[in-house]
Curated annotation (Swiss-Prot):
Entries under PROSITE patterns matching the protein: G_PROTEIN_RECEP_F1_2
PANTHER family: OLFACTORY RECEPTOR (PTHR26453)
Organism: Homo sapiens
GO CC terms in record: plasma membrane
Carbohydrate attachment residues: 5
A Pfam family annotated for this UniProt entry: 7tm_4
The name this protein goes by in its record: Olfactory receptor 10H4
Transmembrane residue ranges: 27-47, 56-76, 101-121, 141-161, 199-219, 240-260, 274-294
Gene name of this polypeptide: OR10H4
Cysteine disulfide links: 98-190
Location of this chain's protein in the cell: Cell membrane
Extracellular side: 1-26, 77-100, 162-198, 261-273
Keywords assigned by UniProt, alphabetized: Cell membrane, Disulfide bond, G-protein coupled receptor, Glycoprotein, Membrane, Olfaction, Receptor, Sensory transduction, Transducer, Transmembrane, Transmembrane helix
């Protein structure tokens, strides 16, 4: 093949919100800042409540606490940089910083998905095998499950980041996104095998996510079958209520992800791509603590008992 003169890229420019009207950027900054702070405070409140309330020292709430940690870290990996770019004219990011951001976003994102799977398994064991629950979900087993979710997320993050950053980037250094998004970054690669790399990355990611979703759905098939065998309507309602918050978060998580990554090509613009991406990176983590604190009665009561009534006592 004839040799080509490539200008190797050492840093990237995040174009994300650069095309937006300037008067909208402070509004978006304020909106995303409030959502970011609420995400942090909401998840910290859940973690503090579980730590304080000894009745919540159960496997289900251990997994929920770990989920809150993963959501905080996922949000911190992306949102602060996005907020800074909204008010700045300097949007460059170094090669190493871009690789780090991609690794941590994938690591915490996949850890979140694996934790949702583990929480589904926990509900399956609690409802379908209640007599064996203490054996199957012992503290040691729970610790192993949590460790596996973090290890799995780390492996996925390292795998994708290593594959992508082994490519050579040349020509334009503009990433048409507000963070180092893998598909936007791959468009800047100058090697002939880029298309096969894209297919490989997509296959790895989709297989892992669809695999998690399939196992969650399978667990709920068995859960619903077990609930339908409960004779009283009150018993069925009480049992299913323990699953509602988890199921709602799963539906929200996968719905937004599917809408962003599986949308038909051509039905998007630079504006809509950036805004839709924030639904998954900002809005979904923002919703999660709201869903768990409102839909989980036991957690809601514990928050009221330990925080709301202390700081906002009822007027006499």
């Amino acid at each position: 093949m004839p040799s080509q003169n490539y200008s190797i890229i050492s840093e990237f420019n995040l174009f994300g919100f650069s095309a937006f009207p300037q008067h909208l950027l402070p509004i978006l900054f304020l909106l995303y800042l409030l959502m970011f702070l609420f995400t942090l405070l909401g998840n910290l409140l859940i973690m503090a409540t579980i730590w304080i309330e000894h009745r919540l020292h159960t496997p289900m709430y251990l997994f929920l606490c770990t989920l809150s940690v993963s959501e905080i870290l996922f949000t911190v990996a992306i949102t602060p940089r996005m907020l800074a770019d909204l008010l700045s004219t300097h949007h460059s990011i170094t090669f190493v910083a871009c690789a780090n951001q991609m690794f941590f976003s994938f690591m915490f994102g996949f850890t979140h998905s694996f934790l949702l799977l583990v929480m589904g398994y926990d509900r399956y064991v609690a409802i379908c095998h209640p007599l064996r629950y203490n054996v199957l979900m012992s503290p040691r087993d729970c610790a192993h499950l949590v460790a596996c979710t973090w290890a799995g997320g780390s492996v996925m993050g390292m795998m994708v980041t290593t594959i992508v950053f082994h490519l050579t980037f040349c020509g334009s250094n503009v990433i048409h996104h507000f963070f180092c998004h893998v598909l936007s970054l791959l468009k800047l690669a100058c090697e002939n095998k880029t298309s096969s790399v894209i297919m490989g990355v997509m296959l790895v990611c989709v297989t892992a996510l669809i695999g998690c979703l399939f196992l969650i759905i399978l667990s709920y098939v068995f859960i619903v079958a077990a609930i339908l065998r409960i004779p009283s309507a009150e018993g069925r309602h009480k049992t299913f209520s323990t699953c509602v918050s988890h199921l709602t978060v799963v539906v929200t998580h996968y719905s937004f992800a599917s809408f962003i990554y599986l949308k038909p090509k051509g039905l998007h613009s630079m504006y809509s791509d950036a805004l839709m991406a924030t639904t998954y990176t900002v809005f979904t983590p923002f919703l999660s603590p709201i869903i768990f604190s409102l839909r989980n009665k036991e957690l809601k009561n514990a928050i009221n008992k330990n925080f709301y009534r202390k700081f906002c006592p009822p007027s006499s």
